[in-house]
């Protein structure tokens, strides 16, 4: 029964991630068609959107992966990180209005994939962010002061990831406590019939 509940939860997370993937693509497409948007390589951006859409369609709707797993969700979020990084790189680096899309991945990962995967994804996002920040300055002007400014700008991402991970862990512990309480007899502490179904 617990496996069915876990699979049902993963299916719900997967549906949410599918909506997130399509909304992300629509948002990037809307930014792309805005007359005031700044895109360095328009063909590269169009190609990235087409490849990302093909990935989502093939990964989600080809029925190759019928059973939902956390690693499937993690792989999809890594693809989202690469897509966001490419879009941010093409639209102004760390000054891009699309930079905050990383928060969606951090929050989703923290709520659904656990602390370790969230830490790995946050490390990947951090590397992308600092690469984008470093590539936006001249070689001789990069200094400790500039590194401090980048770190302070990026600190809210760390806080969001950390606090969301803590909240998700607390919710998971509370749910497990409620399951244990509902599966045991209040007076004797032994498992009741519901625990064996």
Language model features with spans:
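Hydrophobic transmembrane alpha-helices and their membrane-interface boundaries in multi-pass
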Residues: 16-93, 101-106, 125-127
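Membrane-helix interface "capping/anchor" motifs
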Residues: 65-70, 110-121
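Residue-level signature of transmembrane alpha-helical entry/exit and packing/kink sites
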Residues: 73-77, 99, 145, 149-153
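Juxtamembrane or sensor-core-proximal signal-transducing alpha helices
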Residues: 58-62, 152-182
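Hydrophobic core segments of transmembrane alpha-helices in multi-pass, intramembrane catalytic enzymes
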Residues: 98-106, 153-160
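Short, Lys/Arg-rich, polar N-terminal cytosolic tail immediately upstream
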Residues: 1-10
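N-terminal membrane insertion elements
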Residues: 17, 114-166
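Conserved nucleotide-binding and Mg2+-coordinating catalytic segments in signaling enzymes
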Residues: 179-197
């Amino acid at each position: 029964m617990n496996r069915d509940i876990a699979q049902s939860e993963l299916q719900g997370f997967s549906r949410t991630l599918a909506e997130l993937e399509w909304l992300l693509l629509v948002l990037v497409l809307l930014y792309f068609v805005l007359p005031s948007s700044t895109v360095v390589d328009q063909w590269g951006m169009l190609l990235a959107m087409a490849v990302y859409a093909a990935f989502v369609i093939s990964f989600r709707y080809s029925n190759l992966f019928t059973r939902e797993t956390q690693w499937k969700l993690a792989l999809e979020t890594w693809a989202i990180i690469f897509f966001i990084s490419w879009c941010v790189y093409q639209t102004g680096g760390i000054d891009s209005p699309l930079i905050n899309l990383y928060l969606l991945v951090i929050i989703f990962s923290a709520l659904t994939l656990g602390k370790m995967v969230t830490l790995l994804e946050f490390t990947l996002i951090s590397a992308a962010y600092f690469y984008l920040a470093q590539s936006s300055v001249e070689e001789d002007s990069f200094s400790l002061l500039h590194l401090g400014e980048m770190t302070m700008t990026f600190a809210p991402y760390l806080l969001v990831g950390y606090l969301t991970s803590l909240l998700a862990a607390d919710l998971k512990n509370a749910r497990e406590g409620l399951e244990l309480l509902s599966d045991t007899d209040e007076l004797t502490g032994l498992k009741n019939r519901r625990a064996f179904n």
